[in-house]
């Protein structure tokens, strides 16, 4: 007789939830799948669309990661892989992984999260492991989520300590190593008590396999803080290098060569390179979360001047690239192709993409803007009121590379127009391509002024 598999639910099937769902569906023990996995989405139009797409074998995420695509196709063939819009399906699940978006809103910051936990409290049983993966303002779980969650559980005569509530923030990276970022990235975790921490650790080890990849914190608030500090550190470094990008042109220096020389020192090997700007769902919002904690949860007056300035600089960072391009040519009535629309390489994720904002700004300056990106569908580009360019074409007045897709590194510049201006604003082209363009007077690299 076949042993009944333990049911695991993944709440949220977006850029974090979907690969998590696929990884869990593929965990095996003794050549047998370990879990019956249920993916649950919101019961609204967007959520229903995602569920219908999965049931009809239509991907909602296009990925350059072969492993992601392999696991996705495998999941479609399994009878014990389910998707749903109904939180009542949690009743039979002993493990729940929560991967939903969290954003600061004027009046309803915690509404979606609290509503979700209200429903979870109505449907779960004792001894259920809950792992919350969402990035949150430090103090959210203990001050906002858990008190209300505990009250709702008590209505069903379940004590909070009878549920294994834990927190382990995600470090998922869309792109060519999408699945690897889940199974190989170090994880931090904590829980409301010793047993919750232990249950969380044991489950994460099913995904990671290596204990050395795990760091346990004493409290959930420490774990929440770790994610915000991690992303704030990165955002500040990006803002810092923008100052040097601006001065490098006036000094007529090759900033990229300087940075690569500095990187050889072990203490400085993670210094950032000049680029178009901050994009994606995390770095554009996460640094502000500690300010929210200070003001709304702690009711304190901490100003966080460094983080505040970094956020301001990063929001305006594309202006550095715009000024750089404008300094080389007049943009009005020019036919421009931008290569790259996602926020990072080898993904179709356009959330808060600086490339899209850059294209919109060029359009407002009177340019006729086309966008070419092998990972993005035409309708997604046209929603931004930008022309879609399906294939790379050298017959433009200006070609601007903004995202370092691997496919762009294979381009040969044989038929480029004599007067075409070519820009690399984000370290997109490889050394071979740069060498082939070295003698072209109309080729410009952000941060490299005398290469």
Regions found by a protein language model. Name each.
Residues 1-451:
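Structural/interface elements that position substrates and couple domains in central-metabolism enzymes
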């Amino acid at each position: 007789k076949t042993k009944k598999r333990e049911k695991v639910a993944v709440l949220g099937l977006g850029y974090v939830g979907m690969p998590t769902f696929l990884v869990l569906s593929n965990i095996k023990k003794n050549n047998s799948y370990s879990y019956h996995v249920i993916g649950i989405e919101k019961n609204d139009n967007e959520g229903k669309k995602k569920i219908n797409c999965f049931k009809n074998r239509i991907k909602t995420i296009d990925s350059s990661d072969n492993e992601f695509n392999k696991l996705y196709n495998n999941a479609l063939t399994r009878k014990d892989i389910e998707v749903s819009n109904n939180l009542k399906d949690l009743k039979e699940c002993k493990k729940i992984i929560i991967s939903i978006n969290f954003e600061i809103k004027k009046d309803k910051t915690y509404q979606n999260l609290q509503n979700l936990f209200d429903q979870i409290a109505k449907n779960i049983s004792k001894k259920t492991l809950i792992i919350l993966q969402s990035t949150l303002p430090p103090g959210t779980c203990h001050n906002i989520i858990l008190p209300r969650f505990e009250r709702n559980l008590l209505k069903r005569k379940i004590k909070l300590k009878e549920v294994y509530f834990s927190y382990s923030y995600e470090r998922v990276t869309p792109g060519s190593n999408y699945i690897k970022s889940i199974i190989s990235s170090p994880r931090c975790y904590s829980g409301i008590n010793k047993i919750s921490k232990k249950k969380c650790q044991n489950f994460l080890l099913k995904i990671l396999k290596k204990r050395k990849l795990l760091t346990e914190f004493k409290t959930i608030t420490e774990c929440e803080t770790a994610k915000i500090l991690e992303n704030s550190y990165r955002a500040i470094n990006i803002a810092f290098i923008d100052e040097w990008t601006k001065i490098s042109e006036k000094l007529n220096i090759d900033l990229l060569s300087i940075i690569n020389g500095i990187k050889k020192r072990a203490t400085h090997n993670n210094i950032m390179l000049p680029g178009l700007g901050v994009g994606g769902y995390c770095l554009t919002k996460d640094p502000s979360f500690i300010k929210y904690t200070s003001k709304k949860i702690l009711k304190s007056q901490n100003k966080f001047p460094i983080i505040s300035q970094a956020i301001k600089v990063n929001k305006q960072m594309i202006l550095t690239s715009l000024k750089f391009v404008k300094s080389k040519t007049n943009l009005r009535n020019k036919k421009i192709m931008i290569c790259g629309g996602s926020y990072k390489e080898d993904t179709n994720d356009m959330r808060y993409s600086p490339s899209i904002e850059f294209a919109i700004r060029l359009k407002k300056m009177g340019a006729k803007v086309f966008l070419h990106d092998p990972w993005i569908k035409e309708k997604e580009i046209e929603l931004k009121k930008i022309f879609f360019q399906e294939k790379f074409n050298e017959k433009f007045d200006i070609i601007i590379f903004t995202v370092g897709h691997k496919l762009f590194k294979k381009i040969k510049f044989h038929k480029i127009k004599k007067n075409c201006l070519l820009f690399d604003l984000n370290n997109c082209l490889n050394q071979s391509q740069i060498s082939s363009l070295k003698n072209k007077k109309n080729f410009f690299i952000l941060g490299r002024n005398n290469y």
